[in-house]
Amino acid sequence: MSLRPMMRNDNASRMLGMVVEHDAPGESRVSMTVRDDMLNGFAITHGGLVFTLADTAFAIACNEDERVTVAGGADITFLKSTTAGQTLTATAARRARSGRTGLYDIRVTDETGDLVAEVRGRSITTDRRPPAPVAEPVEAPGPRALHDPAPERDEALTTTEVYR
């Protein structure tokens, strides 16, 4: 399995414990075990994290060559809730690719094979080259409790600080 350079640098997916199980041009399979800190206020997996898993599988599938491909849009339909201890798997497959645009379907299933969510992703290929992989992956910070206060600052964050 060859991990694309973008995945070697993907601290967010690493922090969430995602595992790339399959990586081929136009397709991928990524899994993630749901932890307690991934649950929302109803004690079910936060929908944003289900989407993040699907988005990671989508990103791997659509980055097929030496040009950076990004999401141009995506729609998700949630079909089943899950909870801590369950393993979710996102399987992405290219449906069409024409010029710089692509269309991908991503299915998220639980460990029994039940469908949890479906995503339709639209990709746009740029002229940019992927960044060089970092020599050593950055250790992603662990989750911060929602009730922990943010660090005090005398001034608001600038846009540059937000996007660092």
Regions found by a protein language model. Give the residues of each.
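Terminal targeting signals and extreme-terminal segments of soluble enzymes
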Residues: 1-138, 142-164
